[in-house]
Amino acid sequence: MKYLLTIAIVAMMSAFTLAGDPSIHIFKVKSIEGGTIDFSKFKGKKILVVNTASKCGFTPQYEALEKVYEEYKDKLVIVGFPANNFREQEPGSDAEISEFCKARFGVKFPLASKISVKGDDTAPIYKWLTTKTENGVLDATIKWNFNKFLLDENGKMIAYFDSKVTPDSEEILKYLK
């Protein structure tokens, strides 16, 4: 009986371990500048993750993202993930995207290298963000550009916001005040 109980406990612990780490701090992604964005370096700050595009009706949200980043950067990191998943609204190279964001919106928050946020080639970090069994909180479907995920200081999921929720809306800012 003790033997069966031990096996059951080990099996449960293994299943829990395989279920995923409920912290985004396990991820490292390629920066648009060619280096690495290490999410473990953001421990102690909230993180807002956004899939972005340069030729989208929501592209002006870059301005609000930068404004929020500048105002709350002592306790918030914003990481943009350019993606070309929706009507090819992010066709440029990493260099072109970086130049556009800096020149047009003065973006200083970290931008990752262009990735896929949906489909068979979804980047691992976006699989984690959109899958409850991975992030421990919610399932989300990325339906368009500028969807946002807010994570707490421990890298745990707080909330998901669709494209229509602007970065400077009270829906997001209430978590930062």
Regions inferred by a protein language model and the residue ranges of each:
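Thiol-based oxidoreductase modules, predominantly thioredoxin-like and allied folds used
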Residues: 75-93, 108-119
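Sec-dependent N-terminal signal peptides
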Residues: 4-13
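Conserved helix-turn-beta segment immediately C-terminal to the redox Cys motif
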Residues: 43-47, 55, 59-84, 102-105
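Short, internal strand/loop/helix patches
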Residues: 24, 95-144
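N-terminal "domain-start" segment that seeds a small globular fold
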Residues: 18-40, 123-124
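Thiol-/selenol-based redox modules, centered on thioredoxin-like
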Residues: 124-127, 131-177
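Amphipathic alpha-helical repeat scaffolds
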Residues: 31, 51-55
